[in-house]
Regions:
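N-terminal leader/linker segments that precede catalytic domains of diphosphate-processing enzymes
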Residues: 1-185
Length: 185
């Protein structure tokens, strides 16, 4: 069976000297991993690998994602594939958890008010991943892939009908952003 490339994010925060990691419960009626606790994430969308998506990655952040990911056989992933995984990680984090991993042209994180104003677009982004790139373009934002730390690489077990070749990343929740679960997933 075909394995689809996917990206998953461990959102971290420190609370009273304890490290917390966000997990979300998937809906009971979903076809894949129904009613399971998971980290935000999902498969790469065609738009994540587009030239428009690459243009929404700050040039100084490109080096941080290129060269750090490898295949199961130890071969370095192509830069375009590595960038697509990082963009997918940011898109899925906004889509599923409402946390926007993006910065403005000056490198400043998005304000809580700006993130709140963009929340209604999450449903559109879930239906069409290209809408995330359109949002970044319209708001003149860049995905904040620099702080994403590669954590692990997992393959869905062969007994599952849907299989994913998943890269896991970790990142602290940006200051002043709150998690808001997407109840449709």
């Amino acid at each position: 069976r075909l394995m689809r490339a996917a990206a998953t994010v461990l959102l971290l925060r420190e609370l009273e000297s304890e490290l917390e990691v966000l997990m979300m419960r998937r809906g009971a009626g979903l076809a894949f991993m129904a009613d399971m606790w998971v980290f935000p994430g999902g498969r790469i969308d065609v738009a994540d690998a587009s030239a428009a998506a690459r243009a929404r990655v700050a040039p100084e952040a490109l080096a941080s994602c290129c060269g750090q990911l490898h295949s199961l056989h130890g071969e370095r992933l192509a830069d375009d594939d590595a960038i697509a995984l990082h963009v997918a990680a940011c898109r899925e984090t906004f889509e599923e958890a409402g946390v926007l991993l993006a910065r403005d042209r000056a490198g400043r994180p998005c304000s809580p008010d700006r993130v709140a104003a963009l929340q209604p677009l999450r449903g559109e982004i879930e239906r069409d991943g290209g809408r995330f790139i359109a949002l970044l373009e319209a708001e003149d934002l860049y995905v904040d892939i620099g702080p994403l730390v590669y954590w692990s690489h997992w393959i869905t077990p062969s007994i599952e009908p849907k299989r994913y070749d998943t890269r896991f990343f970790a990142i602290p929740v940006p200051p002043d952003q709150a998690v808001s679960a997407d109840l449709s997933e």
